[in-house]
Every structure is written in structure tokens, then in C-alpha cells.
Amino acid sequence: MTRYQHLATLLAERIEQGLYRHGEKLPSVRSLSQEHGVSISTVQQAYQLLEQQQMIVPQPRSGYFVAPRKAQPPVPPMSRPVQRPVEITQWDQVLTMLDARYDKSIIPFGGGSPDVTQPSLKPIWRELSRAIQHNLTEVLNYDELAGRRELREQIARLMLDGGSVVTADDLVLTSGCHSALSLALLSVCQPGDIIAVESPCYYGTMQMLRGLGLKTIEIPTDPETGISIEALELALDQWPIKGVILVPNCNNPLGFIMPDARKRAVLNLAQRYDIVIFEDDIYGELATEYPRPRTIHSWDIDGRVMLCSSFTKTIAPGLRIGWIAPGRYYDKLLQMKYAASGTNVPSTQLAACNFIREGHYHRHVRRMRQIYQRNMEIYTCWLREFFPCGICVTRPKGGFMLWVELPEQVDMVCVAKQLCRLKIQAAPGSLFSAAGKYRNCVRINCALPPTEKHKAVMVKLGEAVKVAME
């Protein structure tokens, strides 16, 4: 975090604590500069950031004042999906989303990429170079099928933060969380099996289920507490469900952290109905609370929770490193990995291992938690300012996604097509539902820095939504 960001955070905390009251004049630029031992330009940048966040307002020749408090947009209500098994479609829309990744002229508000421009990632660049220069023969050869042991040992230590006690021998490395989840499903399911999912559910997971020939049943999900335990139990009574996919920590796209009591309740249901829990923890390290939230896997005593994660969101997607703790399905999963993809890339494993071992990983993740939290606050302010009344916005407890529910008459599928012509990519809510629900919703990627350029995009998005309401 830069000096001006640190100062802005400090001032924001003082405002939230009531030390500076709404309408009160803030200290002058010069006095703050002297108080904190920073330059005048640093104070000016901090005030500009707080102005962007609509926490303060400038008055000509008078200085800065604390802005009047504005009401937060309400949180969306619990989802109400169709509760019956369905086959997934919408591949064409997803393919359009994926193609936009490679077009540098498109602004990817609908994507899921993290911010890989931060200086705290410089050590991983050095480690990648070093891995190739000093281990040439090693990086050109096959690796262990389960993945490099040193990296598995480092990951096992990281998992302790989420309450999971495992050893390197309990883990299998993959080419990402998507790959880990796919292998987990292959190890347990047969084509035609039914898998329960949260609703809304990440579209990549939906398309994975489609590709494996599986049916899905969407379960109502609360944007603050997670999947409805009662609705899941009802579905388990009615249908031969094989397992449930959950993102309980910093959920994508809703951003909630499921309370511990509800995590244990889901695990109790899984034990009673003898189903598998496929736990996706890819965003868990990006929780704003500390210590980070526990995984469902941390309470598992009979190996029925298959925990999947990766460095895709915390370090960089280009590393292509994920992992899975497959529990009782270890042997089957290793067989599936050999059949599907074989071994991992040695060079990126070496680099990631050293990045963690030397302490760079924790420093980087701490930095990104703060940046993403501040980004989401700014984007929420922009939504309040540039979008019509009547919207609902999630209040994520981590990660970097916002889920926005718009008035019923807005069709974000049509709006997204119009924005595409303006070189703006949006992710309509219908992508996150097997039944095509949530057409009046949109997911926004707040990993994109809140620059003037991206502010202008939010203005255009708000204008397009207003036109769609006419």
C-alpha cells in the first residue's frame, strides 16, 4: 500500500469512527503533511482518493469537508431458482466472454482476472527467471504425478490458516482450481448424475458440469449467509443428488462468507445423505477478516469433503497451479489426473515454492486484501452515483466481485451486447444460472483499478441501464 493510500485509509477510519463528523471541515493539506511527515502531494492524492470514494467533498477556497452520509444500496434478496435438475446451455455466451480476454482493446468488467500489476509480484518474476536459469535440466523433465513435494509442503502449511490439517501426501497439484474441481467430479460422478450448486453459481463451474454430462439443481442462496440449508435438505429428500459444489468463503459472485454454524450444518447434511462436498476455496485467502475464515474441509472427519483451490486469484492465473485435498478419493483422483493431464509444469512450481518460502506470498496477499476492499468500496460509490434508483448491491467480505441486481425490466443480456460495441465486456447474471435466471443482474470485476478510465466505463454502463429501463 502506498503512502497516500495508507493516509486515505487512516482518514476514512477516523470518519467512520465519528472523529470527523459529517459536514465538518478536515485538516488542511499543509497541517496533515506536517502531522504525518509526508509530502503535500501525498496528502493531495489521499484527499483525491477519498473524494473518489464520496467520503469527502471539496469546497472552493475552503478546503475539504466530510460528505453527508448516503444510504448504502440494499443487499439483493435470497435467490429463488427453479429447484429441479436441468441441463446447462449458454456455451455461446460464455465463449464470447472467454474470447474477450485476448482482445486488449476490450475493458474486461465481466472477467474474473486478478490485478497482476502490483509491485508485490516482482519477486515471482525473479523466481520464474531463476527457476529456468538454475534448474534447466530439472524444468525440462517430467515431475511427480502428485506435483512437486516441496510445493505441496508449503501449501499444506498455508492450509493451516483455514483450519485444514493435511500433509504433502494428502495433496495433489493440478493446473488450476478449474482443473482440480473437474478431476474431483470425474473421480466421483458418472454422466447423468445430479450435482447441487449455489444459485447464482460461477459460469465456469456450470460449463464444467455441462462438459462432464452432469445435471445440476440450483439451491436458493442468501447473499450474506450462503446456501439455504433447508432448501438443500429438501432437494436431497426429492432427488438422487451425488454431491454439492460450494464456495463458502468469499463466494463468487455474491462475496459472502458462510458462518461456521452453517458450514457445519452443510457437513452434517452431507454425512446424513452420504454425498460429497466439492469445496472451492479459490478466494478464501482474500477474505477481509483476519484470521481468514475456516474451510468446511477443516471439520471433515471421514474424507467426504474434496477441497479445491489455486494461486489463480492470489498470485496470477498464468502460473497454472492449483491443488486438491481429495480425502477418501485420493487414489481415484490420481488415476484421473494421469489419464486427463499427466504431470505439472516444474518451472512455475519451483517459482511458487520459493515465493512462499521467502515470505513474499503473505506480504502480497495482505496488500491485495486491502486494495480489493478499497476498490469495491469505490465501485459501490460509483454504482450509487451513476446507476438508477432501485438497484441492490452485495457487500462482499472478501474477493473482488460485486453482484448488482437491477430493476426487473432491465435485460442485461441485451445491454451486454450493446456494451460490446463500445468495447466494454459485461457479465450478465443469466450466465450464472443453469435455467437462465438473473437476466436483470450483472457481476462487476473490482480487481480493475478504479481509475478515471474505469470510472468513465461505469458511467456508460449506468447510462445503458437507464436506457434499458425506458
Model segments located where?
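N-terminal basic, amphipathic alpha-helical segments
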Residues: 1-129, 334, 338-345, 354, ...
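Conserved core of the PLP fold type I
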Residues: 138-273, 278, 284-300, 372, ...
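Short beta-strand "wing" residues that participate in macromolecule-binding interfaces
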Residues: 57-58, 166, 426
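AMP-binding (ANL) adenylation modules
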Residues: 432-436
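Conserved core segment of the aminotransferase class I/II
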Residues: 124, 301-370
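Short Gly/Ser/Thr- and Asp/Glu-enriched loop/turn motifs at secondary-structure junctions
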Residues: 61, 168, 395-399
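Conserved glycine-rich beta-strand-loop-beta hairpin in the small C-terminal domain of fold type I
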Residues: 370-380, 391-405
